[in-house]
Amino acid sequence: MVKVVWTDLALADLKSIHEYISKDSKFYADRYVDKLIKRVDQLENYPQSGRMVPEFSKEYIRELIEGSYRIIFIVEADRIGIIRVHHSAQQLKNI
């Protein structure tokens, strides 16, 4: 089992997602963010999950898709670094 570490940027993404959805419903904002976190938790047991991020073509930069969001992460020997939680409608530039 590997350790999953969230970057400050990824945590800020989660906060922004929560704030945006909360404008309509705090209940659904809590529920959706929990769903994203649970998806990331699966990486502890399955670190090679998801696919390579097409914009970067590097095997160690991968993504999971959850709803409209792309969870971008870096696979290292002993840990997974969650670097962004990015809406799929937005262009992914630098990470």
Name each model feature, range by range.
Residues 66-69, 74-95:
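Enriched for short, Lys/Arg-rich terminal
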Residues 57-63:
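Short, hydrophobic/aromatic-rich segments at coil-to-beta transitions
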Residues 1-2, 95:
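Absolute protein N-terminus
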Residues 39-41, 61, 83:
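A short hydrophobic/aromatic micro-motif that marks alpha-helical segments and, especially, helix-coil
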Residues 3-57:
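Basic, Lys/Arg-enriched alpha-helical interface segments
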Residues 49-52, 60, 88-91:
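Glycine-rich, flexible loop/turn motifs
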